[in-house]
A protein has these predicted regions:
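Basic/aromatic DNA-contact patch characteristic of tyrosine site-specific recombinases
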Residues: 1-57, 63-70, 74
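Intrinsic-disorder/low-complexity loop/linker signature
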Residues: 9, 19, 35-36, 107, ...
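N-terminal core-binding DNA-recognition domain of tyrosine recombinases/integrases
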Residues: 43-61, 69-156, 190, 210
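Intrinsically disordered, low-complexity segments enriched in proline/serine/threonine
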Residues: 27, 31, 141, 165, ...
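Basic, Lys/Arg- and aromatic-enriched nucleic-acid-binding interface segment
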Residues: 175-213, 217
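A short, basic/aromatic helix-end/turn motif that makes direct DNA contacts
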Residues: 219-221
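DNA breakage-rejoining catalytic core of tyrosine-based enzymes
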Residues: 135, 149-189
Length: 221
């Protein structure tokens, strides 16, 4: 299947671990092949991220990584490719398909930041696989990129010894950052006027402290 062709029916499944298994967190994503066999390398990487002390990630992060790998391994199954034998070209074709076709789940185009997040997750997985001896070489490489002092660097961009130079993943695409527009004072007053306690207090805390949306929603007052 080329990057311009439509995907067929989804063949890889993702299930969530049930309660009662001490070694596997509840809700942990488990990828199953078309033959309903656990995709072992994906399971091994995710379980390591979820359970190793000092390196464990939040459950939501593991869920996101699982969804990214689900899409990648489903693409591999549909094209008949072994995950260990892919090259940069196959990952690029998968990336290009996301850039040119809408999500099969939301029916909306993928944001470029979403595409990059998925590519980076897959590259993290392959970096881990090489470190564990599953593969000999990485199916991607880095290029030197000059960035401004205020530009956000990706998780897979390594700082070079030269000022303003980073090694960027060749498979990621340029993102056009859209900065949020802050509310004016009069707009804030109108918002506060429609909020009762404790929600007004929560809004004031969020404005004063810069709380993230998830942190704000988790407040108990």
């Amino acid at each position: 299947m080329s990057d311009g062709e439509q995907r067929g029916q989804i063949v890889v499944r993702i299930i969530r671990a049930a309660m009662g298994y001490a070694a596997i967190p509840t809700g942990f994503p488990i990828l199953l092949s078309e033959r309903m066999a656990i995709i072992e390398p994906a399971f091994a990487w995710l379980i390591e991220l979820a359970t190793i002390p000092g390196r464990s990630h939040a459950a939501e992060t593991i869920r996101t990584y699982g969804e990214h790998l689900h899409d990648w391994f489903d693409s591999l199954e549909q094209t008949g490719l072994d995950w260990r034998g892919v090259s940069e070209a196959e990952i690029a074709a998968w990336r290009n398909r996301m850039l040119s076709q809408p999500s099969p789940h939301t029916k909306r185009p993928y944001a470029r930041s979403t595409v990059n997040d998925r590519v980076r997750t897959v590259c993290r997985f392959y970096a881990w696989a090489q470190d564990r001896g599953w593969i000999e070489s990485l199916p991607f490489h880095f290029v030197d990129v000059r960035v401004g002092s205020g530009r956000r660097q990706s998780f897979l961009a390594h700082v070079d010894g030269r000022p303003g130079i980073v090694a960027a993943n060749i498979l990621t695409v340029a993102e056009h950052e859209r900065l949020p527009r802050p509310l004016r004072v009069d707009q804030l007053r109108r918002v506060y006027a429609h909020l009762e306690m404790p929600y007004r207090l929560m809004a004031e805390w969020g404005l004063a402290t810069g709380l993230r949306r998830k942190e704000l929603c988790g407040l108990a007052v």
